[in-house]
Amino acid sequence: RGLGAVVAVHVSCLSMSSVVRPGEVQVNSPRNIFKICEPSGNAASPRAKRLAEALSAGGVQAEVMGDMRHEVWFKLLGNISVNPVSVLTGGGVSAMVSDTSLREAALAPLIREAMAVAKAMGVDTSQFPSAEQRLDVAKKMAQGNTHPPSMLQDFQAGRPMEIHAILGQVRAFAVATGVPTPTLEVVLALVATAGRINAEKRLAGEGGGGEDASKRPRRDEGGR
């Protein structure tokens, strides 16, 4: 009784959505992209194409890609700045990317450092947008959008944050490749400490009000 030894197709999802309750997800944006890739990198895979066609038939934009590492890093570079910094500032995307000082001191350096790590890991970053371009796009997309980043929503709801997935693993790769990441190290330490203190307060009954965190809406950050 199991799934067998079939190798799963890899999928990277770029979508703005909220977990209304366990098992129920609300899509909050008409722009939803699924990037599909075989572990082997075979962009001509019949099953990957069938999956893309099935998703497209359901109204979702789906693309078959040849290098999932490229897609994962592309998405990560969109999350590594505004997501953790939102926990420290309490601000939404529009407010943060519109703040010139914050962009120069934290947001842009985080993206540049992570991009340097990706390059050191063998990822072709030549076609990736620059840090400034990413932030400009984020600013444009955030206009009229009041949804806070997913890490901030998790923080406010008392749920575990994706600290390791978004920051910690990049830091581990940086150490392994010898790439300096001073901004990332500071932000990682601050966010981890904020999460720990927040959890301690909730355990002490100072911050949660007894509400079941699993029932609170959560936006799943999809690279924007």
Segments from the language model and where they lie:
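Helix-loop-beta segment of a Rossmann-like dinucleotide-binding subdomain
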Residues: 23-38, 89-99, 147-156
